[in-house]
């Protein structure tokens, strides 16, 4: 079974054709996805070749591809740096050509440029990528069954009267 490519994730996609602007890739349900020529300078890729890319959308909502590896993928919970603020929210750097919006409604409190925020990558009702700091809406209060000695990834979220609240494996508190 083939996994359908989703925005905010990395996938190996097949090159369909070479065009003036870059390469058109087979994005499955997303349709043709552009990998801009500036991303593939010096590489010889052609129809039938596979290339590992990160999928995101441009300013007009069209799916795009990049060879860059982002700092966050769909469903992950890292600290990201706020690079600017605007009348719709803040923008965080995820290592891709277009910064991600952290809308005011998704903030835990006001954020400033150069601050770091703990966020999860998700999408809005229209399917556009965004981040949220309202982690309670996305994380479970119960962890999967772990065995003693299992490795987990932890991200400290904030302190409480009892200690620190941590995110376990990007999906639970």
Q: How would you name each of these model-derived features?
A:
Residues 1-173:
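Single-stranded RNA-binding regions, centering on S1/OB-family and related RNA-binding modules
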């Amino acid at each position: 079974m083939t996994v359908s490519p989703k925005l905010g994730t990395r996938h190996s996609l097949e090159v369909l054709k070479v065009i003036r602007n870059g390469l058109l890739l087979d994005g499955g349900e997303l349709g043709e996805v552009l990998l801009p020529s500036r991303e593939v300078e010096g590489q010889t890729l052609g129809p039938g070749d596979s290339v590992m890319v990160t999928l995101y959308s441009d300013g007009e909502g069209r799916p795009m591809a990049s060879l860059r590896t982002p700092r966050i993928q769909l469903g992950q919970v890292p600290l990201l740096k706020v690079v600017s603020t605007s009348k719709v929210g803040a923008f965080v750097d995820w290592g891709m050509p277009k910064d991600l919006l952290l809308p005011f409604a998704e903030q835990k409190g006001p954020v400033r440029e150069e601050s770091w925020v703990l966020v999860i990558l998700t999408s809005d009702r229209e399917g556009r990528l965004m981040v949220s700091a309202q982690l309670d809406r996305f994380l479970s209060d119960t962890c999967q069954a772990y065995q003693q000695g299992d490795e987990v990834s932890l991200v400290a979220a904030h302190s409480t009267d009892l200690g620190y609240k941590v995110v376990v494996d990007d999906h639970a508190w």
